[in-house]
């Protein structure tokens, strides 16, 4: 007998999560650990593996006599790894140790689990039986040793084959899936290639902008030329060499016409290359192609003249447009300056007496403070010769009549006073006699009131005969 397979596991900081007694003979326990280590030996080689955090599940069954049973230990790690150990046979159980010994054909398996003081130990050993007990006495015999080694090698080979069979089965399944995916990709590529080949085999579609054949092109050219000549005869215009197909005359250019010289140069280079090779794109001979080339060249010359003449016309129109824009711009600037909002009062430039304004003159949305002395020169006195001036004239006429009547009365009074030479009646002693000028002044002041507006205050002029322009301007400002 010899130990064929060995496994030793040690786990730290083990805590029992729960224990479940399903029946009197079936028990379930679960443990959790922080870190652990497991060492395996197979023949003359071994491996060591460490874990960080995981769980251990232990299921064991006992018979009625507690002499037989089974034990299964499952180890799971957070990293996704797992291990399983199981055994069935004779049972040895205590408070902290559970051990089972399984005896099969030529092999004996022992599984032991011990849990004590926060540590859990797992031991798994497989012992192989090679020969019977009498044969063990002849271990010194060379033949027996050779036989023993052959049996050991056979067992190792068998185990290796089993493992290889398992790995190969997994690899075959994986390879099968890869082959299926590869076949799908190949079929897809073949379909795309077939579709591409079918499109290449189709006849090329002619572009809409390809030139028509030579016969049709010449026919259309002659027809258009004939129509233009007939139209020019009807209109009284002599046909010249500068008349184009579209009816335009040399020097005239529509503003929406754009000429791409670069594209024409590319076409010319292509025609020259094709002519040098012997045939053009439409399969024409060198002579026909040369005629087309000459025709295109003459058209290019005419186009160049057209561009040169149109440039002058455009420059003239642009200069006129620029002048008009400058004129409109100057007018706009003047209007804006006139309507600008000026908060600082303007200074008086007049040498006459300056009268400060009491209100601002408002013209639409523009506000500007204007002194009275600047308004006065622009006042047309004839405009204000309305009711106020008419009233003033009436007052003058009345005063003249009253003055005449008063002169007569005064003359009569002088005669009476000369005759009587006494104190005038109706006058107290010690009073100053009334004078003619005082009566006239009172009469003038009573009749010289000029009303500018119903809402404004009435103002009296000192002298109705003379027109005070400064006072009139101030009154107009207050009214406005």
Swiss-Prot record:
The keyword Transmembrane helix does not apply. Keywords: Host nucleus. Its main location: host cell. The keyword Aminoacyl-tRNA synthetase does not apply. It is found in: Host nucleus. Residues 156-165, 175-215, 225-236 have a biased composition (Basic and acidic residues). Pfam families: U79_P34. Belongs to the herpesviridae U79/UL112 family. This is Protein U79/U80. It comes from Human herpesvirus 6B (HHV-6 variant B). The gene is U79/U80.
